[in-house]
Structures are given as C-alpha cells and as structure tokens.
Amino acid sequence: MTALRLRGFDIHKEFLGRVAQQEVLEAVRGVVRQAPFFRPEVPRGGRMSVRMSAAGRYGWFSDRRGYRYVTEHPEGQPWPEIPAPIVAIWDQLTGLERRPECCLINYYDADARMGLHQDRDEADFQWP
C-alpha cells in the first residue's frame, strides 16, 4: 500500500473498505455507549464545543485546573478497552510492538470548533 505524504502526514487513501469502515464505526459507537460523549470545561471557564470520549488506559480531560490524561471517564468508570478493529489499524500501519495507550474520540457537530493547535506538554512528540 502506497501512502500519500502531505506536510508530514501519511494519507492511506482507500485503506479501509466500506465494511471495515462500518466495523470501526460500530466499535466506536460501542465505546461511546460505555463512556458517553462529554464537553470538557476549559481553564478560563465555559465548555468546549467539541464532544469527547476515549478508549484505552487513558482519556483526555479538561477542567478549570487544566487539561490532562485521566484513567476514568468523568462519570467515574474506567475507559473501555480500545476496540479490536482500531488496534488492528494500529498494527497494520505502524508495525510496532508498542501498544496504544489511548484512543481519543472527538465528535464535531455543525457548531463545534477547534482551532489548529499542538499540546506542548506532551511527554513524547514522536507518537501520535
């Protein structure tokens, strides 16, 4: 499979066929049933317009104290496991033995906005 390289990103056009896309979508819906979407609070007050969830050991969370990775959904339960179809994509595209620790899920409705940004306090910029 040949990737299209654009501004440092590898684009794998047609990597997932229709059936595989539907499997991923159903897997994500299963995660969201267990860990419903929430709108994070920002440090200056107010809430983000994007709705979020996660799977894996950690999920992204933000409140007035700032943002961070946490081991539990805001409702108190651990994040669900990363679904097998998503782990399979990781395996196929990375070829790494290292396993992903989290899978962030963002839902943007028609009114949601998130500007281009980089989280500058990440421990390792080599990993997605």
Describe these PLM feature segments.
Residues 1-128:
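Non-heme Fe(II) oxygenase metal-center motifs and adjacent flexible, charged/small-residue loops
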